[in-house]
């Protein structure tokens, strides 16, 4: 087991005391109060883990001291207890090491979820709809709120494209490994010969960005307003409530027409634009860090095939960690998605521990 520097732990405990005292004194302004409250919430978990680790380590040292005693019965008792006590200390150390890993500053944020049908025509659009329902059900189980920002329905159902806000604490941390190409293998309802078809859809999960995260210069925006359109292209209202925002430097275009209010559509379009620009900035920074590249579970590239959903076999396979679950229906219902997410998070943590020299 890698030793955890005691002075680092003491510094964390001291910081926890300072933040607690500052908040208790009630002298922080509103902005500082919010930041300190978030910091304290994060520190509380780490401090609890430090205390658990130190208690377990002290118990192990006590058992090891008993092994040095002259009483044969005490030595025998200590020898019997040591494996269990040592395992408990190592488990506490591992839990603490994970909490001490570098944090992704976006993990606690809400997210923008984008799903686009890929190869496979109508079947791909139906699969994109299946994926959206999977994430919507998963979000419901987590107590998150899902709001569709824009959608382009498929001719036989599903979506050619759907963009939604998923609001809640820690959404990005749980969904960020979903970015990539998802493949489905099944017999379409329109297939008369019973042949299995392969289709695909791409998923992108972007951390929701606030104005403090990314500055958007109004002079860089081209904003067009128009009447909202229905599925067949017909205008569905008489006011120009739909908004299309083009960010000239990057070429990013966002179109939103879901709300009747132009003001609300503009706000939603700006939220999506900020998220895309923020993710672009994060990707550029990540690409510059070789250690981060080694620690990623998959690249997060939208073209990277990350998962296959095989209906005839009732299985889901995540190719990044070679994990197969024969729980296709449960995964698509959102109830078993955590099994995949937890495995991906664990793999990511193991890679980070190795990169930090703690694995």
UniProtKB/Swiss-Prot annotation:
The keyword Transmembrane does not apply. Residues 283-305 are annotated as: Disordered. HAMAP family: Rel_fac_1 (MF_00093). Keywords: Cytoplasm, Methylation, Protein biosynthesis. The lineage of its organism: Bacteria, Pseudomonadati, Pseudomonadota, Alphaproteobacteria, Hyphomicrobiales. Belongs to the prokaryotic/mitochondrial release factor family. GO terms for cellular component: cytoplasm. SUPFAM superfamilies: Release factor. Peptide chain release factor 1 directs the termination of translation in response to the peptide chain termination codons UAG and UAA. It comes from the Bacteria. Methylated by PrmC. Methylation increases the termination efficiency of RF1. Its main location: cytoplasm. The modification N5-methylglutamine is found at residue 234. InterPro entries: PCRF (IPR005139), Pep_chain_release_fac_I (IPR000352), Pep_chain_release_fac_I_sf (IPR045853), Prokaryotic/Mito_RF (IPR050057), RF-1 (IPR004373). This is Peptide chain release factor 1. It is found in: Cytoplasm. GO terms for molecular function: translation release factor activity, codon specific. The keyword Cytoplasm applies.
